[in-house]
Amino acid sequence: KMLDKLIKKLQTHSGIESKKDIQSAAKTFSHNPFSELGKSAMIGDDAAVIPKQSGLLLMASEGISPSLVEKEPWFAGWSSVLVNISDIVAMGGKPLALVNSIWSDKSDLEKHNQILSGMSFACEKFNVPMVGGHSNQKSPYSALSVSILGLVDGPVLSSRFAEAEDELWIIVNKDGCYYKDYPFRDAATKASATLLR
């Protein structure tokens, strides 16, 4: 009964509900753009696998929740880098570089600068460079998207290869706390760069 309650709660969690938004993209694009790479290159994982002669490139992108960008611009900037790095590492890769797209209202330069500051802080802490991007300060709203390129030299850690009886490892920093009223923990902004890297 307890497990059933947990499953039901997770199924209606805002983080899970928002995954439904991926369906239109999944219906539009090829599910296996690099078929020669097999299951590891199928879309829907934490990062895209792109063929390269020595090792494989990983690519990922995250759009940040508009309400987070609006209410917490610095933390949105920080999070945009963190979630991208997490996606690359989750697939066994090393982050190489990031790019961003920021849309904001020119009358709110402070918000724009806070987003940049949050991204810059995360880039320094994780030692991953922001190598370019796009800014538009003539928008009636604020929006943020960040993309990352990574490299994997060993096996790709893809959920497609999971099997019954596999061990599941969860690596967690138990320090930190929930961030304000949001349903996620912040265990990284105050952690040392050495621990995070």
Residue ranges of model-derived segments:
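Helix-biased detector of long, well-ordered alpha-helical tracts
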Residues: K1-R197
